[in-house]
Structures are given as structure tokens and as C-alpha cells.
């Protein structure tokens, strides 16, 4: 499920945020700050009092209620963290950057399923795990560079591969191509490419929204849903360009890094 806490959170907490901008936990904090996020940014780090000028909480128990949580911590710590955030702090949206889930081991798949079950029980949105994050005009919750020029009529880009997303963004930035949003779905445990298209279709405003969608597809959980909403958006005047990975040897290797979505 895609909700307003995911798209336009009034408050964000980065679990595992750090001062090291060369690591995901530090880079994502930097991007949120540099992106001009106007809500309240919070960080949980048990070893620091301040992260990049932002007060750091040492434990989840110290946090006020928060809309969106971004997890940049080891996979084995994520299920309990999601449980606590959803139950104790009313978090309604999660972006899990961490890898080490169903794309790697059966034990990782169990951790991933636990997280999904918790999100479903509390009515929370889930992006990931194993992704680079979500980027829109409201919040730049990605740990990668470059950050493209954002414009409401720019491209909506949805990718199953974080590495491919970065490659395409690097190429697009040099050509001056603007974006409206960038979605890295990772393993797509709850929200897949077809779910993002569904949201864009059902909430489409021809005066306000982008008319161009770019898809990099590794796996599709519900092909009929993808086709239905892609066709609907095209009838509304949108143009969709899609690349399906996995047909070549190199594509198959890339797709296998997100086998948790198969």
C-alpha cells in the first residue's frame, strides 16, 4: 500500500544514520538535508549525540511518534525494529535500505516475511528491502548520487534494481533530463512496480502529474495488474518506456540479486 506517510511524511527517522557520508546511513541523511526536507528529521544512533547537525536519539524508546522510518541497519535487526516502530511509535511507512533478506538466504526470507506481516498488521507501507530508497520533491530518501533535477512534469522512474537506477540517473543527469520521482523497489516484498503504477493511475491528474513513466523491470508479481494500469495510463495520455531484465546472461545475473521478489 502506498500512503501519504510514504510520499509526504511530516516526520522522518533514519535508523542507523551516521556522520560518514560515504556509507548509506550517512549518505541518506545528507541527501534528505540537502534536498530541503521541510518536515522533522530524526536519527537513531546509539553511539552519537548529533548526526550532521541533527540531534541523535540513542534508542527507539526516546522517539516521538513519526510518519516514515528508513532503516539502514543489519538485516537481522530489522524485524524487531519494525515491530517496535509500528507498535510504539505509530510509524505508517518504512523504507528498508538493508540487504541480506530473501535475495540471499532462506533465513533472510523469513526476516522479510516477518517485516511484511508487521506492516500489513499495522497498515504500514513498505519499500524494499534491499533498495536505494525513494526520491520525490518532498523528500530525497536515497543514499546514492547523483540527485537529478526535479520537476512535476519530469519522468517518473520505477526500478527493480538500485544499481541500474543509479546508472540511468547518471546518464540522464548529463543530458539534462528532469525527473518527478524515483522509486527503487528492491525486493518488492509489499510494493512492486505494478503497485506503483496502480497508484499513479488511480491518482492521475493530467494537469499536475508527469506523463512519462520509465520502468526497469526484473520481476513482476502481478503481470495482469501491470498491464491493466499501464494501458490505463496510456489511454490517459501517458507514455511508458519499459526495459525487462533477465533475458540475457548478464541480465539474469542482475535479476538474481533480487530473487526475493520472485
PLM features per residue range, with description:
Residues 1-262:
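Catalytic-core regions of core metabolic enzymes
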Amino acid at each position: 500500500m502506498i500512503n501519504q506517510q510514504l510520499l509526504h511524511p511530516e516526520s522522518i527517522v533514519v535508523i542507523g544514520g551516521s556522520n560518514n557520508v560515504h556509507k548509506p546511513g550517512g549518505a541518506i541523511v545528507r541527501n534528505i538535508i540537502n534536498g530541503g526536507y521541510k518536515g522533522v528529521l530524526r536519527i537513531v544512533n546509539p553511539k552519537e549525540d548529533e548526526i550532521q547537525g541533527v540531534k541523535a536519539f540513542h534508542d527507539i524508546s526516546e522517539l516521538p511518534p513519526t510518519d516514515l522510518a528508513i532503516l539502514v541497519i543489519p538485516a537481522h535487526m530489522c524485524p524487531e525494529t519494525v515491530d517496535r516502530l509500528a507498535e510504539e511509535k505509530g510509524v505508517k511507512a518504512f523504507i528498508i535500505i538493508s540487504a541480506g533478506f530473501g535475495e540471499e538466504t532462506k533465513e533472510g526470507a523469513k526476516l522479510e516475511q516477518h517485516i511484511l506481516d508487521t506492516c500489513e498488521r499495522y497498515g504500514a507501507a513498505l519499500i524494499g528491502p534491499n533498495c536505494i530508497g525513494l526520491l520525490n520533491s518532498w523528500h530525497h530518501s536515497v543514499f546514492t548520487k547523483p540527485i537529478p533535477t526535479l520537476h512535476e512534469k519530469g519522468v517518473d522512474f520505477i526500478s527493480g534494481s538500485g544499481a541500474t537506477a543509479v546508472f540511468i540517473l547518471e546518464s540522464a543527469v548529463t543530458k539534462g533530463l528532469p525527473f518527478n520521482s524515483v522509486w527503487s523497489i528492491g525486493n518488492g516484498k509489499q510494493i512492486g512496480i505494478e503497485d506503483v503504477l496502480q497508484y499513479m493511475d488511480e491518482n492521475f491528474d493530467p494537469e499536475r502529474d508527469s506523463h512519462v513513466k520509465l520502468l526497469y523491470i526484473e520481476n513482476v508479481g502481478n503481470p495482469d495488474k501491470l498491464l491493466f494500469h499501464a494501458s490505463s495510463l496510456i489511454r490517459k495520455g501517458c507514455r511508458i518506456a519499459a526495459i525487462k531484465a533477465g533475458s540475457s546472461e548478464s541480465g539474469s545475473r542482475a535479476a538474481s540479486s533480487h530473487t526475493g521478489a520472485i
